[in-house]
Swiss-Prot record:
Belongs to the RimP family. It comes from the Bacteria. InterPro entries: Ribosome_maturation_RimP (IPR003728), RimP_C (IPR028998), RimP_C_sf (IPR036847), RimP_N (IPR028989), RimP_N_sf (IPR035956). This is Ribosome maturation factor RimP. Signal peptide: none annotated. It is found in: Cytoplasm. Required for maturation of 30S ribosomal subunits. Keywords: Cytoplasm, Ribosome biogenesis. Its main location: cytoplasm. One of its GO terms (biological process) is translation. The gene is rimP.
């Protein structure tokens, strides 16, 4: 049986893609009323604006009303995934090659559960990170969560835009 988050993902992802957005994360919290949090990013690398979030929110709201997946009243929150966005799909790692990432693992790897480094490559369900002076190979299935890191280099690029 799929979780409510998976069900919501299934019914909204294609529409968001058609609008030029990547569905980054769906989270349902609370009881009465439930809060449906949705994080989006731009497929073309541009910044997500308030108008983008409003457009996406209207579309998602209409779909959720038709699909009737959530039984009681709920609040819908649509936001940009942000500069330190979560990496929740394997494909995300290839999109953000050479970017700094923080990774938390489900279990120990080389005596550690946390790694931070630059993504070198992602292939065959493995993530290759450059951590300080060594390369670390992480099986994607071991990753509990991962987020991009806002570095000085990224910040400077943003200022130039």
């Amino acid at each position: 049986m799929q979780t409510i988050e998976q069900q919501i993902t299934n019914v909204i992802e294609e529409s968001l893609t058609d609008m030029g957005f990547e569905l980054v994360l769906v989270k349902v919290k609370g009881v009465n009323p439930k809060v449906v949090e949705i994080l989006i990013d731009s497929l073309n690398g541009e910044r997500i604006s308030v108008e983008d979030c409003t457009k996406a929110s209207r579309t998602i709201s209409a779909i959720l009303d038709v699909e009737d997946l959530i039984e009681a009243a709920y609040s819908l929150e649509v936001a940009s995934s942000g500069l330190e966005r979560p990496l929740v799909k394997f494909e995300n790692y290839n999109r953000f090659l050479e970017r700094e990432v923080k990774i938390k693992l489900k279990e120990l790897l080389n005596g550690k559960t946390r790694y931070q480094g630059k993504i070198i490559k992602a292939e065959n369900n493995k993530i290759y990170l450059k951590c300080e002076e060594q390369e670390v190979l992480i099986d994607y299935d071991l990753i509990k969560n991962a987020n991009l890191v806002l570095t000085e280099e990224v910040f400077k690029k943003l200022l130039k835009q």
